[in-house]
Amino acid sequence: MNRKNVTRTITAIAVVVLLGWSFFYFSDDTRGYKPVDTSVAITQINGDNVKSAQIDDREQQLRLILKKGNNETDGSEKVITKYPTGYAVDLFNALSAKNAKVSTVVNQGSILGELLVYVLPLLLLVGLFVMFSRMQGGARMGFGFGKSRAKQLSKDMPKTTFADVAGVDEAVEELYEIKDFLQNPSRYQALGAKIPKGVLLYGPPGTGKTLLARAVAGEAGVPFFTISGSDFVEMFVGVGASRVRDLFEQAKQNSPCIIFVDEIDAVGRQRGAGLGGGHDEREQTLNQLLVEMDGFGDRAGVILIAATNRPDILDPALLRPGRFDRQIPVSNPDLAGRRAVLRVHSKGKPMAADADLDGLAKRTVGMTGADLANVINEAALLTARENGTIITGPALEEAVDRVIGGPRRKGRIISEQEKKITAYHEGGHTLAAWAMPDIEPIYKVTILARGRTGGHAVAVPEEDKGLRTRSEMIAQLVFAMGGRAAEELVFREPTTGAVSDIEQATKIARSMVTEFGMSSKLGAVKYGSEHGDPFLGRTMGTQPDYSHEVAREIDEEVRKLIEAAHTEAWEILTEYRDVLDTLAGELLEKETLHRPELESIFADVEKRPRLTMFDDFGGRIPSDKPPIKTPGELAIERGEPWPQPVPEPAFKAAIAQATQAAEAARSDAGQTGHGANGSPAGTHRSGDRQYGSTQPDYGAPAGWHAPGWPPRSSHRPSYSGEPAPTYPGQPYPTGQADPGSDESSAEQDDEVSRTKPAHG
């Protein structure tokens, strides 16, 4: 509700109130009479001070016009009072005895007045209903709750293209095909292919699902409607289904077009999830959505794109082919994707020579595009805070720590004893991890308080991993228990600083036993299954499906794993106690140590052998024959380059060609001056179209076309300065920044899975 409508509503209410007050004020004929007690009126009658009187029989009130005012009437010559029921005759006789002029009025009541008593409150309620409905976004008449709230993007909005997306090439390729189908349908129709009716983007928060939808909107060249899943359900019954019908009706009138529903899980949750009666309104909305997506009605030319963080709770009928033909996972970027994202966000920012983006990409395993964008932005803010002019490597390092652990607590006062305990604790983590053979090397260790932690040691993997062996998970347990072992070894008692380490170790050990089947005693069995009751989103949580004896054995195996890791960490620290003291001293002096400094301190530390106490295969004896070598390993042995160069996908080449053409057109247009509307004179901006009459372009690139649009009657003149129909976008050349990004908007959730510090 804008300011103009608010002013108009307030003015209307004020006018109604003023008219009502004026009506009651001017219709009151008792104005000018002073109210007095009945005894005062009787005194005036008995004192023969009454000139005339009027008895209002219906209201049981007496009006007197006195001959002269006095103190009892405060000098007023007109008084009015009430009299008891049945005393009208006595008053008439008393006034007649004093020779006063007496008149009697019997008010029969006005039909209009009686109607106002009942109608006016009703009108007031209707007015309030209309006002609140407008404030909630209803139609102008106040009864448009069933109208769709979808927004249609216009050409004036900022355009996002596939060139602005990096790190999620698979998702871009899938969506690019839809855009290409809309612009070049003949190539697909010749093969009998049909365009997908629906596309579901799913993945963790911050991976770029909404950004991909914005890129489709900027490149599709057809009308694009966007709406949130929560906009369908309202306080009134039937509103959600009505809005779904209205949305698809608008889409059919503008077909071919695209509808984007963000957070579709708000309306697409599995049916039957109403505990104690259910949420029939949401289910009714979902049923209408299912019918509109694939029912008896015609839905030609309408493509539905939806995004969600929780595809597991969506209704199966919503996910079937014919509704969502294509389901695209949008996951966290890999190493190459993180490099591309960092190049995108660092483009246009002054970066110092020591700002190693490749190294930063290696140290940010598990971060999403939104996290990486936040890292670059935090580094820029930190540089501005220090009045710097270029973003340095230390600023990027501090930005990563801020994103992972929170801001540094500079004002915290720590005693020398607590600082010493923290140094030995973090040193125990670092030394235990350094001596283990199957764990990522420690990149940095610090005792600076940050967020809720007193310090942390960061282990950075050399490459992205999708699998972990049992030895690697045991090494993680040793890493986690290193801090607790150092406290017990040096100070002879533990502290509360290891609470997060114990929690992490317990989680790893229990998952090894109950999920991954890494216990020889319990076997390769998954203990605890998720039941499919849909009352809380499809699952009521994990429930034990094993006996109490098995639960006791699980606890024993978990305890056995943690105790073995604790003992291994203790032995490492005992063997290299002098190295631990040296490391703690360096931490107390410098507070933060990086890989080169750690390598010099741990020069004499040797890798420990793997723990074999859990390598029990029963009667199954592993083979001594080594596994075969991969083509990459064989190529490296032969001295051949690996990995072999992979040809660039066709869609990337098309994106590069279109972007280069668009940039060339803009550079040519910049040399010819500018018109009154801000576009170059004699040329047209990429994405603008002109016909005999004005036609919207919906954020399309120059030269776009789609089936059925523009209308055949439209004539489009050709312009010499306009590029040929191409596909926008541009992959980054070697050594240059890629203009893409895979981060999503800031309203997306930032709770992601990433490498966590071992000590909290």
Swiss-Prot record:
Q: Which top class of enzyme applies to this chain?
A: hydrolase
One of the record's GO molecular function terms: zinc ion binding
Bias-annotated ranges (Acidic residues): 740-750
SUBUNIT field: Homohexamer.
Could you give a single Gene Ontology term from the biological process aspect? protein catabolic process
Q: Which residues bind Zn(2+)?
A: H425, H429, D501
Question: Which residues hold ATP?
Answer: G203, P204, P205, G206, T207, G208, K209, T210
Function of the molecule? Acts as a processive, ATP-dependent zinc metallopeptidase for both cytoplasmic and membrane proteins. Plays a role in the quality control of integral membrane proteins.
Protein name, UniProt field: ATP-dependent zinc metalloprotease FtsH
Q: Which UniProt keywords apply?
A: ATP-binding, Cell membrane, Hydrolase, Membrane, Metal-binding, Metalloprotease, Nucleotide-binding, Protease, Transmembrane, Transmembrane helix, Zinc
The record's annotation in SUPFAM superfamilies points to: FtsH protease domain-like, P-loop containing nucleoside triphosphate hydrolases
Q: Which residues form the active site?
A: E426
Q: What's noted on cofactor binding?
A: Binds 1 zinc ion per subunit.
Q: Which domain of life is it from?
A: Bacteria
Extracellular side stretches: 27-110
Query: Per its UniProt record, what Pfam families does this chain match?
Result: AAA, AAA_lid_3, FtsH_ext, Peptidase_M41
Among InterPro entries, the record links this protein to: AAA+_ATPase (IPR003593), AAA_lid_3 (IPR041569), ATPase_AAA_core (IPR003959), ATPase_AAA_CS (IPR003960), FtsH (IPR005936), P-loop_NTPase (IPR027417), Pept_M41_FtsH_extracell (IPR011546), Peptidase_M41 (IPR000642)
Q: Where in the cell is it found?
A: Cell membrane
Query: Which residue windows does the record flag with biased composition (Low complexity)?
Result: 650-669
